[in-house]
Amino acid sequence: MFIIAESNQLYLGDMLFYLVSFLIMAALVWHFAWKPVTQMMQKRADKIANDIDSAAQSREEAQKLAAKRQEELKGSRQEAARIVDNAKQAGESQRAEIIATAQQDAQNLKNQAQKDAEQARQDALRGAKKDIANLSIEIASKLIHKQLNADDQQALIDTYIEGLVKHE
């Protein structure tokens, strides 16, 4: 029995030694290994969380910038359409002005041509009147062999011209 008791004591002593060794080892591991590992893991978790937050912020900023760019693009398209419309309106206005000016110039030319034609007609009539008067006087002088006085000559001319105007 004594051997068994010694064996139990040895077994109990070894167990106690192992337990104390384990506790010391656990304390050393806790102090030198577990804390730095958990701190490193916490830092890593914090960094990952920050990276995720940063990525989310970057994505939101990118979406905001994309929306702003789309809005600016829409605004620039509207501005371009407005500029084109203004240019079209200015072109139409200028075209209408040019047409009105051309029509006025054409009417002025037509009126001037009519005046010139009437003046030429009047000049031709006066010239013809003088020529006819001179020819009539010559013919009458030769036929009558006498000179007509101015009043007779004027009456003869007026009668002849009235006859010409009626035939026109």
UniProtKB/Swiss-Prot annotation:
- Locations listed in the record: Cell membrane
Q: What is its main location?
A: membrane
- Output the Gene Ontology cellular-component terms: plasma membrane; proton-transporting ATP synthase complex
Region annotation Disordered: where it falls in the sequence: 61-80
Question: What is the recorded membrane topology of this protein?
Answer: Single-pass membrane protein
Q: Which residues cross the membrane?
A: 10-30
UniProt subunit comment: F-type ATPases have 2 components, F(1) - the catalytic core - and F(0) - the membrane proton channel. F(1) has five subunits: alpha(3), beta(3), gamma(1), delta(1), epsilon(1). F(0) has three main subunits: a(1), b(2) and c(10-14). The alpha and beta chains form an alternating ring which encloses part of the gamma chain. F(1) is attached to F(0) by a central stalk formed by the gamma and epsilon chains, while a peripheral stalk is formed by the delta and b chains.
Q: Which HAMAP family match?
A: ATP_synth_b_bprime (MF_01398)
Task: Please identify the protein, giving its name as recorded.
Answer: ATP synthase subunit b
